[in-house]
């Protein structure tokens, strides 16, 4: 299994590029973003800004030893973005979503409203592996780095999946679907919860 560690600050642009590539075919992100050319140009900057603003120093930005994938984990009690964190991704959001920025922000806010408040838990905000490296255990390593810790500390973990094909992958790691929902005319999403293993 790949070795997992915290990303360094200078690696965050590569984290952003890998996550943008990983989510390029994601139904929800495709629904929110206005076209492939804009995605390829703007999404790496958005993911880099999100990782920097919301997870460095607050949660954990985990990468594998060869920088093939990344997981953005929010620590217990820090899953909701602060006003400052939101402001730090405002310009990258405008660049990525363009005229659809307000709709995208409403959609992300509606997803946030489904987030459980209790009990205390780690939140897997984003997990992605560059498509050229998927299927080699990178995603599993990035998940178990935190879920193993959750098991040791008696903490739960939570995520939202925006792709149905990924639901069985998360289930293999102990996550259980809580709800399937649609946001307006968008594609379905799944909320998933994992209780700690004894």
Where are these regions (language model features)?
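A short beta-loop-alpha structural element at the N-terminal edge
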Residues: 3-17, 21
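A short helix-loop-beta-strand connector motif used in the catalytic cores of GNAT acetyltransferases and
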Residues: 42-62, 119-123
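Conserved beta-hairpin
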Residues: 55-71, 130
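Conserved acyl-donor/pantetheine-binding loop and adjacent beta-alpha core of acyl/acetyltransferases
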Residues: 70-128, 134, 183-185
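Conserved GNAT acetyl-CoA-binding A-motif
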Residues: 120-122, 149-162
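Conserved beta-strand-loop-alpha-helix junction that forms the acyl-donor binding cleft
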Residues: 125-134, 158-167, 185-187, 194-196
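Conserved acetyl-CoA-binding loop-helix of GNAT-fold acetyltransferases
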Residues: 135-148, 172
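Conserved active-site alpha-helix within GNAT-family acetyltransferase domains
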Residues: 140, 152-154, 163-180, 184
């Amino acid at each position: 299994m790949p070795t997992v560690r915290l990303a360094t600050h200078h690696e965050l642009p590569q984290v952003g590029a890998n996550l943008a590539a990983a989510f390029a075919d994601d139904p929800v992100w495709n629904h929110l973003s206005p076209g492939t050319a804009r995605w390829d140009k703007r999404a790496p900057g958005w993911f880099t800004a999100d990782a920097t603003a919301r997870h460095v120093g607050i949660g954990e930005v985990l990468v594998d030893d060869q920088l093939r994938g990344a997981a953005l984990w929010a620590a217990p009690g820090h899953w909701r973005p602060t006003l400052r964190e939101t402001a730090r991704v405002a310009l990258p959001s405008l660049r990525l979503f363009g005229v659809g920025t307000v709709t995208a922000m409403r959609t992300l806010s509606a997803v946030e409203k489904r987030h459980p408040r209790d009990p205390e838990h780690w939140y897997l905000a984003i997990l992605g592996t560059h498509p050229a490296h998927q299927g080699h255990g990178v995603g599993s390593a990035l998940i178990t780095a935190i879920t193993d810790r959750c098991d040791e500390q008696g903490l739960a973990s939570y995520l939202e999946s925006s792709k149905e094909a990924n639901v069985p992958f998360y289930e293999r790691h102990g996550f259980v679907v809580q709800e399937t929902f649609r946001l307006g005319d968008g594609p379905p999403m799944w909320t998933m919860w994992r209780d700690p293993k004894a």
